[in-house]
Amino acid sequence: MNHKTFQILLVAYMILILGLSSMPAQDFPKTWLLTWDKLIHLVEYFILGILAMKSMNTISYRTLRIVLPFGMLFGVLDEYLQSFISGRFSSGWDVLADMIGVTIGALLILGNDKE
């Protein structure tokens, strides 16, 4: 796939993240999986990091310096918006898990591209 396709996937995925984050807490099914909240954040943003890196024209350390702040700001925006949703709250720990996920995903793509 070319970077334009990944740009479309990235935007669609970001909309999906914001859509899920906008759901009131009582709308989520009660499952054991939701107790793994930080792991879910990490995986969610790991995918975001991969899509963000692949959506760029070139993959380089310079690209990484764009993707990482982008991922962090998107995580902060996501948490901020959650603070307005019934039964949801913002968490710095969630932002940290988001940033770790973006970093791992982006570094994975950078490492694979450099080989």
Segments predicted by a language model, with ranges:
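Short helix-capping/hinge motifs at transmembrane helix termini and TM-loop junctions
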Residues: 23-24, 57, 86, 113
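Membrane-helix interface segments
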Residues: 2-8, 59-66, 88-92
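Membrane-interfacial alpha-helical segments at the cytosolic side of multi-pass membrane proteins
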Residues: 44-58, 102-113
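Interfacial helix-loop-helix junctions of multi-pass membrane proteins
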Residues: 32-36, 77-99
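"…centered on the first transmembrane helix and the immediately adjacent amphipathic helix/loop
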Residues: 1-54, 67
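Terminal transmembrane helix and immediately flanking juxtamembrane interfaces
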Residues: 1-21, 93, 97-115
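Membrane interface segments of multi-pass transport proteins and intramembrane proteases
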Residues: 33-34, 60-61, 113
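Small-polar-interrupted transmembrane alpha-helices in polytopic inner-membrane proteins
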Residues: 10-21, 66-83, 99
